[in-house]
């Protein structure tokens, strides 16, 4: 099994979700199934079918998270010594060359990505273009609207 890179924060977020699924969601869906069974004929019981579907989703998500955590390589960005290069976990200050717009992103695992929070997936086109770059380098990113150029203004490990 391949390792899955996660920041400490991302691993903690997955652990919290796993605990919630096991201690709250699983019990709630079992209760919903029990209540639906009490209504009688299961062959035409929409509540029962919905609860069983939800149970399948919850159990699948539990297995998914457990698998990811078992394969996780947890990386603490503050301990990185990447000599100013962009690596997994680093926070990158960028300036879009055409518009001059400035953005800051942290490169994180797929399950941690949240663009509104400035967290981009290691698998994203922009992260792949940035890996290995240093301050002053320009990254070319194939975006849906065409190729965009970003200058790396700074790289931090926080």
Functional labels for PLM-detected ranges:
Residues 1-63, 158:
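Helix-rich terminal scaffold detector
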Residues 75-158:
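Non-DNA-binding regulatory cores of transcription-related proteins
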Residues 18, 22-25, 40, 69-73, ...:
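Conserved NTP-handling cores and scaffolds of large molecular machines
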Residues 13, 22, 52-54, 68, ...:
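Context-gated lysine
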């Amino acid at each position: 099994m391949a390792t899955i890179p996660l920041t400490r924060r991302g691993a903690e977020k997955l652990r919290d979700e796993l605990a919630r699924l096991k201690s709250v969601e699983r019990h709630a869906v079992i209760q919903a199934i029990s209540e639906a069974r009490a209504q009688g004929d299961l062959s035409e019981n929409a509540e029962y079918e919905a609860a069983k579907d939800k149970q399948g989703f919850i159990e699948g998500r539990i297995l998914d998270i457990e698998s990811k955590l078992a394969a996780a390589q947890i990386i603490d960005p503050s301990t990185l010594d990447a000599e100013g290069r962009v690596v997994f976990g680093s926070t990158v200050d960028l300036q879009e060359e055409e518009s001059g717009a400035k953005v800051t992103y942290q490169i994180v695992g797929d399950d941690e990505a949240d663009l509104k929070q400035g967290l981009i997936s290691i698998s994203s086109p922009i992260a792949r273009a940035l890996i290995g770059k240093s301050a002053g380098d320009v990254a070319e990113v194939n975006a849906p609207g065409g190729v965009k150029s970003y200058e790396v203004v700074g790289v931090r490990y926080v």
